[in-house]
Curated annotation (Swiss-Prot):
Its cofactor is Mn(2+). PROSITE patterns: PROLINE_PEPTIDASE (PS00491). Its EC number is 3.4.13.9. It comes from Shewanella loihica (strain ATCC BAA-1088 / PV-4). This is Xaa-Pro dipeptidase. HAMAP family: X_Pro_dipeptid (MF_01279). It comes from the Bacteria.
Length: 440
């Protein structure tokens, strides 16, 4: 296992380099990054679960403490204003002593409204990076989330440091551990809710710790792309299981999906075919390849797969041009992954913020970047029986492309999605998900 303490100093050097470049270009004294503040529930005295500013956790693994601030200018040692109130109602965060503290100067803040005493002077020369713009105004910042700075940071976030890649490998290991437990629970007869509990127990995470709401879908629920309902009662007939769930480590996410058939049948054969399709697309990944081209290649391969299984009729190109493949596979091939599950910067052509929109026929694609070394992306092709989309084909004259008898056979199983997390290297791809033993 990689030593994070060894990798972390170079990570800070790289982040400092980025800050120095963009602040010099924009004539800023530096950046003040706010971890965030709790959000109070309406007409209540309870807060929503706290989610830290991703720009904050890019520097250090403090992910659960609001009212913290980070002062960076690209030259000096980063300064952390760490919130430690006197509070007998709640658990107060311990003063950090982890590996990263040697690279960060730490000051303690005991009252959130006294932070001005610890912030730099002449805040009109500094940029505030965070969510709470009203706080930035009160404190007197000269700029708030300036577009040029945000575009620069989001563009370069795609290139992961060795420290970040190490964290993401650990996030993948946690996610795979949960997937193995969830698969066992499915074959043992567990309900969706019980499978969720098995996943959380295996990963040692609570529902507020996972990087996104787990999708635990049995049978036809797998046709709902973002299904999170969690039925407590097992279905009378157990047909299929789709799980889309990840792990978190030091603020970095994994995002993994698998689909299983309860018995050997046509649907199991479909899963195996989709698994081969997914691996073939991953083989195409290399620096210089456009992610859009991978998505389009997926539709080409899916068209042939649909024909092979007699779910459709016609020719592959016609299936694509008529939007038939999009009815079975309506979402994008995947996205960038890192501090956020859908990491920022997926549509940026350059550090100036030039936007590349997805193709008009594929509006839900989340990444249009050209691949480069040290990027991390998901590859997650799908095949679903979604009645609302198929009904559109019936209503607008495209019904003859579909073999409705075969569709009816597959409908009770819901759908298939297979998702791996892949690091693009200069000379090879590193499939973190498969390397950890989670095969299709």
């Amino acid at each position: 296992m990689e030593n994070l303490a060894t990798l972390y100093p170079a990570h800070i050097i790289e982040l400092n380099r980025r800050v120095a470049e963009i602040t010099a270009r924009e004539q800023l004294a530096g950046l003040v990054i706010h971890s965030g503040q709790p959000h109070r529930q309406f007409l209540d005295d309870l807060d929503y679960p706290f989610k830290v500013n991703p720009h904050f956790k890019a520097w250090l693994p403090v992910i659960d403490n609001p009212h913290c601030w980070l002062i960076v200018n690209g030259r000096d040692k980063p300064q952390l204003i760490f919130y430690r109130p006197v509070d007998f109602w709640h658990k107060v965060a311990d003063l950090p002593e982890d590996f990263w503290t040697t690279e960060i100067e730490i000051k303690v803040l005991t009252k959130a409204d006294k932070v001005a005493d610890l912030l730099p002077g002449k805040l009109q020369e500094w940029a505030y990076i965070g969510e709470h713009l009203d706080v930035a105004d009160v404190l007197g910042f000269g700029s708030r989330n300036p577009e040029a700075v945000m575009s620069y940071l989001h563009y370069h976030r795609a290139s992961k440091t060795a420290y970040e890649l190490a964290c993401m490998r650990r996030a993948s290991e946690i996610g795979v551990r949960g997937h193995v437990a969830a698969k066992s629970a499915f074959y043992a007869g567990a309900s969706e809710f019980e499978i969720q509990q098995a996943y959380l127990a295996a990963t040692d995470m609570g529902e507020n710790d996972v990087p996104y709401g787990n999708i635990i879908a049995l049978n036809q629920n797998a046709a709902i792309l973002h299904y999170t309902a969690l039925e407590h009662v097992s279905p009378k007939q157990r047909l299929s299981f789709l799980i889309d769930a990840g792990g978190s480590f030091h603020g970095y996410a994994s995002d993994i999906t698998r689909t299983y058939a309860f018995e050997k049948n046509l649907f199991g054969d479909l899963i195996a075919a989709m698994d081969k399709l997914q691996l073939a697309i991953i083989e195409m990944m290399r620096p210089g390849v456009k992610y859009v081209d991978l998505h389009l290649a997926t539709h080409q391969k899916l068209a042939q797969l649909l024909l092979d299984f007699k779910l459709v009729q016609g020719d592959p190109q016609g299936l694509i041009e008529q939007g038939i493949t999009s009815a079975f596979f309506p979402h994008g091939l995947g996205h960038m992954l890192g501090l956020q599950v859908h990491d920022m910067g997926g549509f940026l052509h350059d550090e100036r913020g030039t936007h590349i929109a997805p193709p008009e026929a594929h509006p839900f694609l989340r990444c249009t970047r050209t691949l480069a070394a040290n990027q991390v992306l998901t590859i997650e092709p799908g095949l679903y029986i979604i009645d609302s989309l198929l009904n559109e084909l019936k209503q607008d004259g495209r019904a003859d492309w579909i073999n409705w008898q075969m569709v009816d056979q597959v409908r009770p199983f819901g759908g298939i999605r297979i998702e791996d997390n892949v690091i693009v290297h200069s000379d090879h791809n590193e499939n973190m998900t498969r390397d950890l033993g989670l095969h299709g």
